[in-house]
Curated annotation (Swiss-Prot):
Domain of life assignment: Bacteria
GO molecular function, one term: nucleic acid binding
Protein name in the entry: UPF0102 protein MS1289
Organism: Mannheimia succiniciproducens (strain KCTC 0769BP / MBEL55E)
Family: Belongs to the UPF0102 family.
Pfam families listed in its UniProt record: UPF0102
InterPro entries the record matches: Restrct_endonuc-II-like, tRNA_endonuc-like_dom_sf, UPF0102_YraN-like
Length: 119
């Protein structure tokens, strides 16, 4: 079950990457893991580094994909982005970046792209 869930997650992350590339973003990295959390995708939109969280929900019984990104998850996302930037000799303070959410429903065609999900 865990392996199937991981495979499905990887599939939706790939769909998100393709979707974002079709919107003009450039791929930088995927699945960047840190103790504090993971960055699903790191993309470039012009001069802006975009940290992308990919979420999928088959139904809304336990909340939507968007609702699943709570305050605690947002903090992990920000911390992981900060650590990733440090590996590039940058910081959140000196880098033009944003946090986008790509949320899927039951299928890859049911997609929402929420730019600046974390302000």
């Amino acid at each position: 079950m865990f392996s199937l869930k991981r495979q499905q997650g990887a599939s939706f992350e790939q769909q998100a990457r393709l979707f974002l590339e079709s919107q003009g973003l450039q791929f930088i990295a995927a699945n960047q893991n840190f103790k504090c959390g993971e960055l699903d995708l790191v993309m470039l939109d012009g001069e802006t580094i975009v940290f992308v969280e990919v979420r999928q929900r088959k139904n809304d019984h336990f909340g939507s994909a968007v609702e699943s990104v709570d305050w605690q998850k947002q903090q992990k996302w920000i911390n992981a982005a900060s650590l990733w930037l440090a590996t590039q000799n940058h910081s959140l303070e000196d880098t033009d970046c944003r946090f986008d959410l790509v949320a899927f429903g039951a299928t890859a065609s049911n997609v929402q792209w929420l730019k600046n999900f974390i302000e």
